Regions:
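Loop/turn positions that initiate beta-strands
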Residues: 151-154
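C-terminal cap of metal-dependent C-N hydrolases
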Residues: 76-82, 87-88, 101, 156-178
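Composition- and surface-driven signal marking solvent-exposed, interaction-prone regions
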Residues: 55-56, 69-70, 144-148, 169-173
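Active-site neighborhoods of metal-dependent hydrolases
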Residues: 1-114
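Short, well-structured alpha-helical segments that form the helix of a local strand-helix-strand
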Residues: 51-57, 118-127, 148
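Gly/His-enriched, cation/cofactor- and phosphate-binding structural elements
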Residues: 104-131
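Short, solvent-exposed loop/turn segments at secondary-structure junctions
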Residues: 131, 139, 165-168
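Short alpha-helix capping/helix-loop boundary micro-motifs
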Residues: 135-146
Length: 178
């Protein structure tokens, strides 16, 4: 009903939103019939405007990855001592962040760029996150975690940061990090 009554307005809204987020080349479908293809590719193959493709898909048509990150913002966030590194990836999601987020931070921002020390990266990815969720509070949890301390739970992995690699990509999003 909305498409019939307000289709032109919806198309214009979608056009502005997509163009304001780096365009249809910056949207990669992660599920549905167009999984692994960009919105621009699908629209070109169908010889129609990308907004028409989106309208036909509807609000529940597919998940997608949006390439809109601004590296300046990422660097500013990494420099903030209160920022944690986390991921909303999951095994059911066709996105490499489900398997490669933390390896990528280690590889890129610790080893290659030197934006973080390995200690700070681990704190942002584990210890600070535990504190934010009060997993270090003995009044909240039976066995605290978030630090390597006697009596606390800890899942420890010894690794060489220079050997860590994120192997997942959009073609193979479930590839484990090395």
């Amino acid at each position: 009903a909305v498409v019939r009554e307000r289709g032109a307005e919806l198309a214009e809204h979608l056009r502005r939103r997509v163009e304001g987020r780096n365009g249809p080349d910056a949207i990669l479908f992660g599920s549905g019939e167009f999984s692994g293809r960009t919105l621009a590719d699908v629209a070109a193959a169908q010889d129609r405007p990308f907004e028409d493709v989106l309208i036909e898909l509807g609000p529940d048509g597919a998940s997608a990855a949006y390439f809109v990150m601004d590296e300046r913002v990422v660097w500013a966030l990494l420099a903030d001592p209160h920022t944690v590194v986390s991921s909303d990836g999951s095994p059911s999601m066709l996105h490499p962040r489900g398997y490669g987020s933390f390896a990528r931070v280690t590889r890129r921002y610790v080893v290659e760029e030197g934006a973080l020390s390995i200690e700070e990266a681990v704190r942002k990815m584990a210890g600070q996150t535990a504190r934010n969720y009060r997993m270090d509070d003995v009044d909240v949890v039976d066995v605290p975690r978030g630090q390597v301390r006697e009596g606390w739970a800890a899942d420890l992995v010894a690794f060489d940061p220079a050997e860590v690699r994120d192997a997942a990509d959009f073609e193979n999003p479930h590839r484990l990090a090395e």
